[in-house]
Amino acid sequence: MQVHHNFFISMQKPKSQSSKPVGKRRAEDNPGLYLHIPFCEIKCRYCDFFSVTELSRITDFLDAICREMNLRGKVFKFFDTLYIGGGTPSVLRPDQLNRLLEHLHQHFTISKEAEITLEANPADISVSVMKELHSLGINRLNIGVQSFDNRILEFLGRRHNGRQAIQAIEASLQAGFGNFGIDLIYGIPGQKRNTWIKTLEQALTFQIPHLSCYQLTVEPETPLGQSYKKGLILTPDNDELFELFMDTSEFLEKAGYCHYEVSNFARGDSRISRHNSKYWHHIPYLGLGPSAHSFDGEKRWMNVRSLEDYIQRLNQGKLPMEFCENLTREELQLEALFLGFRTSAGIDLDDFEEKFGWNLWSVKERDYELLLDAGHLKIVNGRLQPTRTGMALADSLALL
Amino acid sequence: MDHIRNFSIIAHIDHGKSTLADRLIQFTGISDERTFKDQMLDNMDIERERGITIKSQAITLPYQAKDGKTYSLNLIDTPGHVDFSYEVSRALASCEGVLLLIDAAQGVQAQTVANLYLAMEHNLEIIPVINKIDLPSADVERVIEQIDDELGLDSEGHLKCSAKAGIGIQDILEAIVKRVPPPRGNPEAPLAALIFDAHYDPFRGTIIHCRIMEGTVKSGDTIRFMSNSATYRVEEVGHFLLQREKRNCLSAGEVGYIIAGVKTVSDVRTGDTITLDDRPCSQPLPGFREVKPVVFASIYPIASDDYDDLKAALEKYQLNDASFIYQKDSSAALGQGFRCGFLGLLHLEVVQERLEREYDQSIILSVPSVRYRFTLKDGSVVYVDNPAHYPGSSSIELSEEPYIRATLMLPERYLGAVMKLCMEKRGVNSTLNYPSPGRVELLYEMPLAEVIYDFYDRFKSVTQGYGSFDYELIDYRESQLVLLDILVNGERVDALSQIVHRDRARARGLQACERLKEEIPRQMFKIAIQGAIGGEIISRTTITPFRKDVIAKCYGGDISRKRKLLEKQKKGKKRMKMIGQVSIPQSAFLSVLKSDAD
């Protein structure tokens, strides 16, 4: 299955052939590597990421993902971000993580300055374990706090409480993680605006480097989605969600965070999630593990969304790919737009023209002018950037 | 001729007309199971979906009766909507008898009665057939009573069947043979053939469907259309079996087709009489009427690049629909398009659907209008069927609008509600008749414009489907007319303009604004919708913008899914028309004519 031999070539080609100074090539244009650890102790009610609760399958899974590395490692070489997500990667013991990382280093080159992030559940975090992880080379944590409010945590079906969330943050700091982020969820049925702002205030007391504030999305294939379908819960309406979105952004920017993506806030540019930014800037990524997606600049493919299939295929020496699509220029264009408008950096008009062969601004000038007037867009240094209200309309902006 | 029977099936909608037709076809064995497609006579997808027949169709069924003789039974199917009542009358004029089909569970309904009256007008033998007798809810006794009391027929001769289950089919065929009189006419007389339909065949040109009343026609004859004296040389004549079957000649009493090098269907007029050029009959058959469109609307391509495609599609479409006319038109808001004439609103909707489905066109239809008559101050008279050509109130001396005489048949219990509706629709000079106990016939004169403006839907709704309705144009009458414009974000959308009665203007303006508010999706900007007469704003609504559409999470695994969703939205957007920066969906243009259902 020779599908991705051009991972590197394809992303470098347009740059090296362009008349632009080589200096414009940025370090973050290197691909990112993602590992999907598909295990959770319990499933949260709202989450539709792929994971299973049969922790007894971890060993077989580790064998399988190492096999996948063997197969992919022959083609892919260099990465400068690594993100271990899931699932709940923190259900792995440090020695298991160690095995994973060692195998990874044998098959891939990870930059010395790489950002290496591990997603962790607050209940799994202790100073000693975090120290161990730090020594393995993990230099960034993303902690699934979601809320400090026990009632909300219970509603979401989380296995930690508010106290554990706070302890996890303190333990991470103590263990030496200067760089870490927490996830928070808002727009929860019954949650008052004040409750949410209080959650943010609580987070601020720790001067957390990175905050992901997600509006609750009710996914149909989840227990929460089922409750919604039965009419058991009432979600805030679109206007309320918009107000909450604006409040969140204003509140955090006032507190010194930059709102650099729809749901992401960093305490200074150096604290942004370098790995996740690759998705939004359309930079290639390789995903390993069941249900993981990969993108080489032209193709996107997805691994099977079943742990047993995944293990079985790799046992047979086959790549566990479920689907692969060749992206047309039009598809890439649309992606570049809706991803770009998600970020405060927006879309570099020159880059866009170089990549797609037409000038975005001159074609859509009439629409964009109106949006500039309406305060949804701005132009900064040749970049078309969404304002705060524009970010909330990223999809519509992309469809103009 | 003694072995020919010409008949039609008439019924209320959904009483099983097409199913019975299928069963008769199957029984006579001209179609085997393998080639059989349900509802053979409803050829168009739309006909099958809506359950209504739009074009007439004919088929000849060879049937060996119990008397040992073989008969040719000509089944002539009829369209089932008031827009096409003239076509129905021509089809019935080609028959000697009808099967009046009644649903055993639903009993006699509005169209049963309306169709019965049409058949009686033509002095046809009427055979009542009770269908669906196998349904658990069937109440045959009640239907028999209704046949006697409500229809005033003799229920003695009724037949029972289940077309679906194939029960009682042979009895029906026998009754057709025994009770429908054989056609009369003299094969040696000068030719007189009644055209009841025509369709277009890409290889042979127009296929004329006709009933030979007198005389004989064969290939090589030169025929003449009596309405316009056009002459053609007959290439082929024959019968309709499952396909066309060539015959040497068609003689008095027969139903069949004539191919005579007629280029388009619009050269043929339904109801016209065909005779021989060298030996014409003395006078045309009665009942011919020039069919004129009464409802007008403009059609525009959604993308202006598709204009040529649309033009080609209309040309092709017209080959098969003689009652559809069109000419070039242009709109400030919607660009190049065509002004089209239709028999009624249903006809308009059928044309719209067929252009979209069969010809793959994405189109916008402007607000439908009738044809108004204005006498200007300089003494000249202009007919205006397009609000864009409204002469301007200062130059008008006299405004007139077309009136119709509406004939409404309904159970007495709905009389109050229907009279109220008719008055609301500016109906005048009402007459009330009681053709049978419990049933009333109500005649009203009212403006045609009120009828195209949702009258039919509301009439059906207030009579719970038991009312039937027919109309004929009578004359033009003086009226107070004004031009109602619609502005979207300050921009006048000429395709939404309407000519309306002054007293109705404000209500219509409000209604149009409300409808558009429902139809136009919220967008990133505030959209103001205004109704205006002259320079004066008479109504106004605002569509508030939506402010957030972005999803919370978009990481590596979400991008493809998200893209596909957006591609879908983009496709939907392409089907909308951009007026300035506002995307207006197709449905909005017709919606302004719809009012709130009571």
UniProtKB/Swiss-Prot annotation, chain B:
The keyword DNA repair does not apply. It comes from Syntrophus aciditrophicus (strain SB). It is found in: Cell inner membrane. Its main location: membrane. It holds the Pfam family GTP_EFTU. It is a peripheral membrane protein. It is an enzyme of class 3 (hydrolase). Residues 2-184 form the tr-type G domain. It comes from the Bacteria. GO terms for biological process: positive regulation of translation. One of its GO terms (molecular function) is ribosome binding. Gene3D superfamilies: 3.30.70.240, Elongation factor 4, C-terminal domain, Elongation Factor G (Translational Gtpase), domain 3, P-loop containing nucleotide triphosphate hydrolases, Translation factors. This is Elongation factor 4. The keyword Membrane applies. It catalyses: GTP + H2O = GDP + phosphate + H(+). Belongs to the TRAFAC class translation factor GTPase superfamily. Classic translation factor GTPase family. LepA subfamily.
